Every structure is written in structure tokens, then in C-alpha cells.
UniProtKB/Swiss-Prot annotation:
It comes from Vibrio cholerae serotype O1 (strain ATCC 39315 / El Tor Inaba N16961). NCBIfam families: PRK15094.1. SMART domains: CBS, CorC_HlyC. One of its GO terms (molecular function) is flavin adenine dinucleotide binding. This is Magnesium and cobalt efflux protein CorC.
């Protein structure tokens, strides 16, 4: 009897969940929120793990996003001028460490094509053929800012290309987007072989200023600077700063928190990336430069 009662006591909640789960497969949910609820219930009931839930929600989110929401803005693009010689190209690629570069002409709004770093290999070393950039430029794919991200992902997969130039309604270049940008919306940040895992989260720039990664934990920040910022509501310095702003700040915006000046030095359409912090008193921070 007790066993039966136990099973019956679980009945309503389990029935409710399975009814919603079965609705997912037997017919379309009534709205987006209903689908989100089913996915989250699946995690609660251990049918999927947290990472899977995040990916499923990421897939849903890109269906509502436009290319302008995830593109790398024009001001942050690393481009190559068609007049550059081989030595100049190698220097740019060594510094930027990207695999693909837009090639531009004197008119910055005219992208002649895409140059792949690997296409320069045959020109390096002794007894190589004379370099002509026109021989290695590949056609550029151009997409409007308003294009849906999920449709662009489908085109990336079907056409087997990895980068597109983004243009505004007047045909001017406004940025670029890669397949990695889209995938990161689904699975989170993707680190490649060039990401510096050992780069310090906090680096001293001058006597009073420090470079701080937005993902630095508040605990580490407090330990370094002797501050007492709370980590009950946010875990990172980026979260602390965004809370103080009350919005997603752009590069160059500044806010003061408890006497500390935070300037956004890098940000994109989704997050704060890096900050410059000016501290009020360095007497107690002489150990930072040594760490």
C-alpha cells in the first residue's frame, strides 16, 4: 500500500511533465515559452544535462537573431590591402593569427575577395613562384545585416564556406561573420590553438591602471585588490560592471564602483570582454606586479 501511495503521489508531477514532453513530439508547442519549459523540465528530470539544455536554447535563439546581432563590426575587422606585398601579408597574419582575411581596395566598401592564410604557403621558402595576390584571392560571399542567422548557418553548411562579408542597406561594408560566430551562440566560446590559455586575467599597465578580463571572478578580483565586492548575484567582474551600468555597455563607456574606475576596452554585441581599471590607492597593491 505504501508503495502504491508513493507512486500515486508522484503521479501528478510526472504526468504533467510527460504530457508536455509528448506534446513536443506529437504536435507543435503552442508558443516558444512552452517549448523552453519542456526543455528545462527535461533537465530537471535528468533527461538531458545542463550543457545540452544550453545548446537547445541556443539553437532556438539563433532562429530569432539577425546577422547584425553577432557580426564582427567593421572597426574590428583585420583586412588586407590588395597592394600589400608578401612580406606585409605574412606580418599581418603572424600578428592577427586568423585563417581568413577580407581583401579590400582603395574603396573600403569594396571587398575584392577573401585570402586564406594557407594559400600563401606555396610562396614561402626558396625557389618559389613570384607572388601575385590576384592569383590567390577567393570570391567573397556577401550577406545583408538583416539576414536570419539560422538561414546563414544552413548556407554555410550547404555551400561549404566559413566567412561572409556583411553589408548595410546602402551596400556599405558593416562587418563580417564566420561560422564560428554562429556556433558560439549555440555551444559557447570556442577556443582555438591560438588562444592564450596562460594570459593573466589581471595585468598591471601603469602605476594606477590594470587590464582586467571581464571573465575574472569577483573572488579573484577581491583577492588581488583587497576589495569586498559581493558575488552573490554575479560571479564575474563583467557581470558586476554590467549591473552597475544597467545595460550592455559599449567600448569606451566608464563607470565608478566604490571608488574604482572601470572603463570598457573591449566589447561586442553580446558581452563585455575586457576592462581597464583605475584603482584609488596602490599602497596596498604593491604585490600585484609581482604575481
Amino acid at each position: 500500500m505504501n508503495e502504491d501511495n508513493s507512486q500515486n503521489s508522484e503521479g501528478p508531477s510526472r504526468k504533467s511533465f510527460f504530457e508536455r514532453l509528448s506534446q513536443l513530439f506529437q504536435g507543435e508547442p503552442k508558443d516558444r515559452q512552452e517549448l523552453v519549459d519542456v526543455i528545462r523540465d527535461s533537465e530537471v528530470n535528468d533527461l538531458i544535462d545542463h550543457d545540452t539544455r544550453d545548446m537547445l536554447e541556443g539553437v532556438m535563439e539563433i532562429a530569432e537573431m539577425r546577422v547584425r546581432d553577432i557580426m564582427i563590426p567593421r572597426s574590428q575587422m583585420v583586412t588586407i590591402d590588395r597592394t600589400h606585398n608578401l612580406d606585409a601579408l605574412v606580418a599581418i597574419m603572424t600578428d592577427a593569427q586568423h585563417s581568413r582575411y577580407p581583401v579590400i581596395s582603395e574603396d573600403k566598401d569594396h571587398v575584392e575577395g577573401i585570402l586564406l592564410a594557407k594559400d600563401l604557403l606555396k610562396y614561402l621558402g626558396s625557389n618559389c613562384a613570384p607572388f601575385n595576390i590576384q592569383e590567390v584571392i577567393r570570391p567573397a560571399v556577401v550577406v545583408p545585416e538583416s539576414k536570419r542567422v539560422d538561414r546563414l548557418l544552413k548556407e554555410f553548411r550547404e555551400e561549404r564556406y566559413h566567412m561572409a562579408i556583411v553589408v548595410d542597406e546602402f551596400g556599405g561594408v558593416s562587418g563580417l561573420v564566420t561560422i564560428e560566430d554562429i556556433l558560439e551562440e549555440i555551444v559557447g566560446d570556442i577556443e582555438d590553438e591560438f588562444d592564450d590559455e596562460e594570459q593573466k586575467d589581471i595585468r598591471q599597465l601603469s602605476k594606477h591602471t590594470f587590464s582586467v578580463k571581464a571573465l575574472t571572478t569577483i573572488e579573484d578580483f577581491n583577492h588581488t585588490f583587497g576589495t569586498k565586492f559581493s558575488d552573490e548575484e554575479v560571479d564575474t567582474v563583467g557581470g558586476l560592471v554590467m549591473t552597475a551600468f544597467g545595460h550592455l555597455p559599449a567600448r569606451g563607456e566608464v563607470v565608478d564602483i566604490a571608488g574604482y574606475n572601470f572603463k570598457v576596452t573591449a566589447a561586442d554585441s553580446r558581452r563585455v570582454v575586457a576592462l581597464q581599471v583605475t584603482v584609488p590607492d596602490l599602497e596596498a597593491l604593491s604585490h600585484v606586479a609581482e604575481e
